[in-house]
Amino acid sequence: MESIGSHCCSSPFTFITRNSSSSLPRLVNITHRVNLSHQSHRLRNSNSRLTCTATSSSTIEEQRKKKDGSGTKVRLNVRLDHQVNFGDHVAMFGSAKEIGSWKKKSPLNWSENGWVCELELDGGQVLEYKFVIVKNDGSLSWESGDNRVLKVPNSGNFSVVCHWDATRETLDLPQEVGNDDDVGDGGHERDNHDVGDDRVVGSENGAQLQKSTLGGQWQGKDASFMRSNDHGNREVGRNWDTSGLEGTALKMVEGDRNSKNWWRKLEMVREVIVGSVEREERLKALIYSAIYLKWINTGQIPCFEDGGHHRPNRHAEISRLIFRELEHICSKKDATPEEVLVARKIHPCLPSFKAEFTAAVPLTRIRDIAHRNDIPHDLKQEIKHTIQNKLHRNAGPEDLIATEAMLQRITETPGKYSGDFVEQFKIFHNELKDFFNAGSLTEQLDSMKISMDDRGLSALNLFFECKKRLDTSGESSNVLELIKTMHSLASLRETIIKELNSGLRNDAPDTAIAMRQKWRLCEIGLEDYFFVLLSRFLNALETMGGADQLAKDVGSRNVASWNDPLDALVLGVHQVGLSGWKQEECLAIGNELLAWRERDLLEKEGEEDGKTIWAMRLKATLDRARRLTAEYSDLLLQIFPPNVEILGKALGIPENSVKTYTEAEIRAGIIFQISKLCTVLLKAVRNSLGSEGWDVVVPGSTSGTLVQVESIVPGSLPATSGGPIILLVNKADGDEEVSAANGNIAGVMLLQELPHLSHLGVRARQEKIVFVTCDDDDKVADIRRLVGKFVRLEASPSHVNLILSTEGRSRTSKSSATKKTDKNSLSKKKTDKKSLSIDDEESKPGSSSSNSLLYSSKDIPSGGIIALADADVPTSGSKSAACGLLASLAEASSKVHSEHGVPASFKVPTGVVIPFGSMELALKQNNSEEKFASLLEKLETARPEGGELDDICDQIHEVMKTLQVPKETINSISKAFLKDARLIVRSSANVEDLAGMSAAGLYESIPNVSPSDPLVFSDSVCQVWASLYTRRAVLSRRAAGVSQREASMAVLVQEMLSPDLSFVLHTVSPADPDSNLVEAEIAPGLGETLASGTRGTPWRLASGKLDGIVQTLAFANFSEELLVSGTGPADGKYVRLTVDYSKKRLTVDSVFRQQLGQRLGSVGFFLERNFGCAQDVEGCLVGEDVYIVQSRPQPL
């Protein structure tokens, strides 16, 4: 039986102490186009050959027995020149133990040029192997043909390039591996990060040439040298497809078709960016420009001569105009994170516009070189026609590629050419790199020295010193030097960005703008180099034992080994903020990590285990950091894939380049390395907590077909055969209606954290749907392997298990706790308000004939409102009636204490009710009664598919917008509250807060309004009325068997509180109903954060009803808290503030946590006893006072 249990996998890493002589692996480059994957041993060089054939396994075994027994190791770099769909990856199986001996797959690492890995094998053996594609769901797709067979020489370093399905291919001659101490980690993310040092290319005599970053990314045609002017227009085979294009995309594709050379293409980009005025159009222009320029700089969109004659100064002038516009866009107050992110990707694709390149005749050195008399005539002609004439007529990126190819050629053999000639050509090469902004980070930083003040120079010199020590240390695993270099880089980048943030004046001289471009490129280059440093650090961390060793250190209460990883993460998150992405969030995460780093792991925190509290607190922040990286990646996935596909198809870009574009952007960014570090640290934290990555929201057991969906949206779920299904859901916002989406849903597995007591959690519990979340990447991958299969989900507080089920698909029962409608909750039975309970007869919506509305104006009291103390179910709804009862209970609570002396006292905000019938009266006064009745009739049968239901809901909402709350009603409300009071307008429908239909969060609440602004107040009430007819509300009532005509809405108006904390209490633990615990979930600020299912976790406390013992179950990590501004307008809106939990008492003060937990437990137990059943309670903490704003029956 295939199973995903609750166990954790052990790490394959071996721990080595910091003082060990072992060093981090060093990365090397095989050729100028291939970057290699993770290395784990020191390199050796050789010139031996490799051959590849196909043979049978029996022959392989015979040959393996004959291998050389000398023990000499061979370094083999393998690249599979093949790309796969986003989310899939490539692995290999093989006969050698280093790749799993056919039992385990060995993953390859992604690069733009294919999938790569490095193996260290015993020399002399015969290696048999084969590639597989590992799908996103975990399934394997093997390449066809016989097993590949490779005869491994006795010693040396080699590389091979393979192609998918070509198992009998003749491999290219092996290339010797040259050393490059300047490259970071395993190479698979290194393609776009040749910024740390100059890219080194070996020549026959061992000389090293400094190559440009442009050359390292080139995917266009190789340089072709000519001895006459044969350039012409060689643009053959390209196709442009403008069908279906419009707007910016159409303009860009037509512009490319009419622009053969580089300067015309740059001018077209300038026109597109400058000509985009509207925000949406502007973002599109930036996105398409970034994609287009990237393809030009990598040679996938070629540039040719078109018969014109424009020196490079023309390109420089256009570049300056583009640069100014980008800086202007990003400096605007309303600049979006998306615009800033995309603009940063355009900068490295622009040429320099320094004074020497805007001169009338720039780059003249090549003319002098081409006319020297100390070089052969043929070489002179090749330089003249291939480089000089082309550069001065129609410069393009291909000129730098040709120059580097020529430089490598003339330096291959020492003494073959004049030393002065070679030296001058090298100088020209550096000038050309400078023009294309393709120099190394060191060269870029050197070029800006002249403009730096003493503080800047000090930061720059410190960075150079740290970098030099790191590069010459000879040990890539020198963690201390890595951390020092990271700190110095951060300091330097901060200095640069501070200067850049001063802005660009409209009257800034050209020289200042040119230097500003250098500063901008340097800070982008520093971010790229941090990617390299963080990658090296991750390798070092793995070498030292990785997550397993970190977890062991926590177990032994020695957490000093966590200091460097947390430092690295803080610095990495700081770099993301410096790049303009969620700066306040990055700052808060950094503050928290530093605070937790400084806190000792205590034996006890209050009455709780210090190790557990330390780990849970850190886990909350690590989850927050990983959420930051996920949101960044999600943004890239929203921005690029559809636009890359549109532009790529129209421009005839190879499908492989289109398919891998976004993955390359994600993997080449610092956010990718931060995500990897978070994954390692979270694994260590989970191991130390004994956690398995599961969180049980609703326990139980169920079976069904596992179906993967993006979200729970009615009408959008895939069709099934009619049997029970278990949903594997990528995202949720907490307001979803599960049964309304599909009546066959038996279970939900959500791949993000979610408050247990969110509206979604409450609804799932009421509907008896087993609900779990999972945040462990390894388990998620295993789960996806079972998509489409009939499985059994078992969830309890102690474990979660997902297994292939032996039960047949014919089984139609939804779960072991079959969903049933509580008939009694909708039955009729008279009771008075003081004995209000879940079985009230008034809790059932009243019935009405098809020709009349449920309530009439004669039901409305004088003045249009009812005092909260007088509210009852028939006139005001269950919520208002419960709040009225709460007000009377609040007085009694002041005299009640728990057995341990903890007070059960609480307060209730003052309030009034706009009763049932008020909406109908407003409809009548607006002459909209008949139109509304007609739409309501259509609503009963409207189909959710095809937009029919949405259209009718929209029409009803338009009717509601035209309504007005009577002036006498607003005047009455004004008299009931203080003059400057802020109010909240809440729903109190006859179809919510019932035992069989809690409708938690289904209807609107509008905060921060005041009757002193009648227009805003009236509009807020109408929004609450309209929320009765949203798509979700209609489908929810259908699922419960309630007619749309039977639904009506009263409005509860209460004093708006400004809480420090908001909470939801369940007086019976949802995860463990027999535990005699009150469970609380707490969020900073207003309670909407909890109720709506905002991404993140709340503080979670459990308090014993009898013993008063408080357990901390989780720490909060919501990114924002919602507040009501006391000085701003009463406009129905919140203020959002970023939360720093290192400053929140509930996180850092164990005594306060204990006291609050006991207080909430006492209040919850008091309410449960007085209401006579388990309660779902909402409230908040204002100063030292507990306020209760709502209590309703808790679904069990």
Swiss-Prot record:
GO CC terms of this entry: chloroplast; chloroplast stroma; plastid
Signal peptide: none
Major enzyme class: transferase
SUPFAM superfamilies: Glutathione synthetase ATP-binding domain-like, Starch-binding domain-like
Biased composition (Basic and acidic residues): 185-200
Pfam families registered for this protein in UniProt: CBM_20, GWD1_pHisD, PPDK_N
Transit pept. (range): 1-54
Annotated catalytic residues: 759
GO BP terms: protein autophosphorylation; starch catabolic process; starch metabolic process
Tissue specificity of this protein: In all starch containing tissues (e.g. roots, leaves, stems, inflorescence and siliques).
EC number of the protein: 2.7.9.5
Primary location group: plastid
Gene3D superfamilies: ATP-grasp fold, A domain, ATP-grasp fold, B domain, Immunoglobulins
Keywords associated with the record: Acetylation, ATP-binding, Carbohydrate metabolism, Chloroplast, Kinase, Magnesium, Metal-binding, Nucleotide-binding, Plastid, Transferase, Transit peptide
Subcellular location: Plastid, Chloroplast
GO molecular function: ATP binding; carbohydrate kinase activity; metal ion binding; phosphoglucan, water dikinase activity; starch binding
Domain CBM20 positions: 66-166
Further details from the record: The reaction takes place in three steps, mediated by a phosphocarrier histidine residue located on the surface of the central domain. The two first partial reactions are catalyzed at an active site located on the C-terminal domain, and the third partial reaction is catalyzed at an active site located on the N-terminal domain. For catalytic turnover, the central domain swivels from the concave surface of the C-terminal domain to that of the N-terminal domain.
Subunit composition and interactions: Homodimer.
Domain notes: The N-terminal domain contains the alpha-glucan binding site, the central domain the pyrophosphate/phosphate carrier histidine, and the C-terminal domain the ATP binding site.
Family in the record: Belongs to the PEP-utilizing enzyme family.
Function: Required for starch degradation, suggesting that the phosphate content of starch regulates its degradability.
Protein name per the record: Phosphoglucan, water dikinase, chloroplastic
Organism of this sequence: Arabidopsis thaliana (Mouse-ear cress)
